[in-house]
Amino acid sequence: MGSINGSKVKTIIIACDAGMGSSAMLAARMTQKLSSFQVSVKHSPVNQIPEQVDLIMCHEGLAARTRSLRPGKVVVPFKLFIGDPAFDKVIAAVRDSADITG
């Protein structure tokens, strides 16, 4: 598990199996919420997550695989695609320069 201060987060990847539907929708939503903080939010299949990423968010069922593919990166899992508190936690940490662990 890694940790990062929200003020250091400049790139977030929303990862899913295919990197198309659900992750694209979530990336668009997070982009809107984080636009005033100059944070880039993109989507990707788990197997293609780029090295240059500060934080990865993925469904909890993909968290172990994501951590094994990108060791040392902060991985924040979520359960629900809509309304999960993990998204609000990340947004608040970026806004408040708080630590994010995952």
Regions from the PLM with identified roles:
Residues 2-46:
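Conserved active-site segments centered on acidic
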Residues 14, 76-102:
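Ser/Thr/Gly-rich flexible loops in soluble cytosolic domains mediating phosphotransfer, phosphorylation
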Residues 43, 58, 76-77:
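Structural signal for conserved beta-strand scaffold positions within catalytic alpha/beta enzyme cores
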Residues 44-47, 60-66:
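Short, polar loop motifs at secondary-structure junctions
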Residues 51-52:
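Alpha-helix C-terminal capping/helix-to-coil transition sites in glycosyltransferase folds
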Residues 55:
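Short, Asp-centered acidic motifs that coordinate Mg2+ and/or phosphate
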Residues 59-60, 82:
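Glycine-rich nucleotide/cofactor/substrate-binding loop typically near the N-terminus or early
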Residues 70-73:
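A short helix->loop->beta-strand "cap" motif at the edges of active sites that frequently abuts
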